A protein has these predicted regions:
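Short catalytic-loop micro-motif centered on adjacent basic/acidic residues
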Residues: 44-47, 73-76, 139-140
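Short, glycine/acidic-enriched loop or turn micro-motifs at the edges of active sites
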Residues: 50-51, 81, 169, 242
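Short, flexible loop segments at the rims of nucleotide/cofactor-binding pockets, characterized by
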Residues: 20-26, 77-79, 138-144, 211-215
Length: 273
C-alpha cells in the first residue's frame, strides 16, 4: 500500500489533536480537506465534506477512536456543497441534541437548505470564539467575499493552525498533503514549471484558484491583512495542500499579496465586462 492509499484510509494527525480527513481523487484538480479537532471528550468537525465524501470522512472519524456523538460543533466556513453536502448524514450519525453549527448569518440562510434540524449559530454572537471544556480556544475572523459574503477563517490558538477555508486553496493535479515551497518562491511570479526545480510550480495553481474564486483584489488584500496579524504555524485550507512552518506560510502570504487580477478585477483587466 503506497502513501496515498494510506492517507486515503486513515486520519492523518497534522498537529496536536488535529486530523486531516480528506481523500485524494487521483487526477482531479480539486481536493477537499475536512478537518477534525479532538480535545478531551469533545470534538469539532470543520468543513465536513460533500455527500459522496461522507463514507470516507466518517470512516476516518471512527478510526481516530472518537464516537460520533462526541462531535459538539460543525464549523462551515461558507455554504457550498463541497463543505456542507453531507450534513444530513453527519446529523444522523452524530445524533445528539448537543450538536450545533457555527457559521456566519449570511451562510446560515443557505446552510438551512441542507438541513433545518441542527441549531445554527452566528460566530459573532459567541464573541467570535468557541472554547472547549479544557480551555482550548478556536477564534473566528471574518474574510468577507473570500469568496462568499459570510466567509471566515478559524484559528486554533493551541497549535497556531489556521483553517483558511478557500483561502490558500489550489487547483492542483499533482496534489500532495503538504506543499513544499522553495525559498526562491519569494521572488518568483509563479510559472507553471519552476525554473529552480524543473517541477510543477506549487504556487501557480494557488494563484489560478484565487483569481477565479475570490471576488476582487480588495477582498483578498483585506483577508491577507487579517491573517498576517496572526501568529500562524500552519495553514490548513479546504482545497489543495497544507502549508506547514512559518517560512512556508510567509512565502504563500507574500505571493498572494502581489497576485493581482483577482475576480472582477481580472475581468476588468481583460476588458471582459
Amino acid at each position: 500500500m503506497d502513501q496515498t492509499e494510506q492517507q486515503n484510509l486513515n486520519p492523518i494527525e497534522i498537529a496536536d489533536g488535529i486530523y486531516w480527513l480528506g481523500y485524494s481523487y487521483g487526477s482531479s484538480s480539486l481536493h477537499c480537506n475536512p478537518y477534525l479537532i479532538v480535545e478531551g471528550d469533545e470534538a469539532v468537525l470543520i468543513d465536513g465534506g460533500s455527500r459522496d465524501d461522507f463514507s470516507y470522512v466518517m470512516l476516518k472519524i471512527l478510526r481516530t477512536g472518537l464516537k460520533p456523538a462526541q462531535i459538539k460543533r460543525l464549523i462551515y466556513h461558507h455554504y457550498d456543497p463541497d463543505l456542507c453536502g453531507n450534513l444530513l448524514q453527519m446529523e444522523a450519525m452524530i445524533n445528539t441534541p448537543e450538536l450545533h453549527i457555527i457559521s456566519h448569518a449570511e451562510n446560515n440562510v443557505f446552510i438551512h437548505y441542507y438541513s433545518r434540524k441542527t441549531p445554527k449559530i452566528d460566530y459573532r454572537s459567541i464573541n467570535n470564539e468557541f472554547v472547549f471544556e479544557s480551555g482550548r480556544r478556536l477564534a473566528f475572523y471574518g474574510t468577507p467575499f473570500c469568496h462568499a459574503p459570510g466567509s471566515f477563517v478559524t484559528y486554533d490558538t493551541k497549535t497556531k493552525t489556521l483553517f483558511s477555508s478557500d483561502l490558500f486553496g489550489s487547483y492542483d493535479t499533482e496534489w500532495a498533503l503538504f506543499t513544499d515551497l522553495n525559498p526562491a518562491c519569494e521572488i518568483c511570479y509563479a510559472n507553471q514549471i519552476c525554473p529552480v526545480t524543473g517541477k510543477a510550480c506549487p504556487l501557480y495553481p494557488i494563484g489560478q484558484f484565487h483569481q477565479h474564486i475570490m471576488t476582487s483584489n480588495a477582498a483578498l488584500i483585506h483577508a491577507l491583512d487579517v491573517m498576517e496579524a496572526l501568529d500562524i504555524e500552519r495553514i490548513a485550507p479546504q482545497h489543495g495542500s497544507i502549508l506547514s512552518g512559518k517560512q512556508q506560510v510567509q512565502l504563500a502570504l507574500h505571493y498572494l499579496r502581489r497576485l493581482g487580477d483577482v475576480g472582477i478585477d481580472y475581468l476588468a483587466s481583460e476588458k471582459m465586462l
